[in-house]
Amino acid sequence: PSPAGQIGMARPATAQERAVVDELVRAAEAVRQLKLRRPVMIEIEDGEAIAESLRSQIEEADIERARSIYGTLGLLDAEDDLHAMFAGVLGEQVIGYYDPETGRLVIREDVMSGLTGALGSEQTQEARLVLVHEIVHALQDQRLSLGESYQKERTSDADNAFRAVVEGDATLAMLAHALRQQGIPLSAATEGIQQLGNHLDLNGLVQGEKLDDAPTIVRVTLIAPYLRGLQFIAAVQGRGGWPAVNNAHRRPPLSSEQVLHPDKYFTREPSEAIVVQDSPQVLAAGFKRVAEDTLGELELGVYLGQLTLSGAADQAASGWAGDQLVIYARNQETAAVWWTSWDTDRDAEEAFNAARSVSPNAPTAMVERKGRSVLIVRGLPAKLHRPVRNEFSKFARAIEGQPAPPEIPPSPVY
């Protein structure tokens, strides 16, 4: 049973409540052009039980990984209670959610009361739209193997891209349902959605004071799957209808770059696979490699944009071609060695300038550019910079003679 079930706060839907949800299921199926294979189990929980369910899904290993990576990069305060922060953000006033692990659609008690009571209020309409979004997740699970897809190991970059498909699909379907109720076809709106995505009001899905107060890296990675994902899926759907969206689940974008620039998804522009080589001197000094990741264009934009008003430097990150970040630890110290590559020397220069502007004024930090590659180092004793620079230089020279990954002609089917 779910954690909420264990504390006795969950109950099955009544026949009347089931009828209300069934109506929303039919709406989701119609707009998304998919049908459920079997009825979705519905449970009603109060707000505190839902918050507790979501809090219980936070893995301690994920918290420590976030602390290790983003703390070392200066994007999170390593002293913060990250568990409390994530729990607060995730537990804020959730209308309902679909759990692919258990196949349950969980709806908040007071929301359900509103849906079966006086209809027509603004909150009730918002709740209906959000539940259509969640029912689309059930369709994804039953028809497009969402549950299996969630289990795959991915880099942060690939995970941001995967979640953009999942949430962008459900958000576009939700908007399509809202438009349909006003007699407006989705085709009339997909281009506008791509252009206005950042200004759309998605309050029912992503909102809350705790989210507003969260560090930029947390806020961006939680909101981007909805907003950037919506823009991406609008481009895919506008090009090939809902069958193309189904295909995006089967062949998801490989990077956040492909989400942020859908043309790069359509041409399947590959990123550069980068493997940071350990410097023997760093290991001999007692540092151990404890984490590695590819953060991609989305998260590099946050890193490079720490001094900007928005907190993200989309322009500086837009020439991204590949990256790998390695975190080293020695006792209580952590250090970051980050190799990045860019489409052109000019893109690398722009990234280099942005990286230098946010680099700590400390002897343990360094930023260097060679051709279209940029090295970022944080937290590493200055005497170890030269061997790290030497390893990076070999990599930079190796790709110097190579152009960035070529674009591949678009496939006619997506």
Each model region followed by its residue ranges:
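Active-site recognition of the HExxH zinc-binding catalytic motif
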Residues: 28, 129-146, 170-171, 233, ...
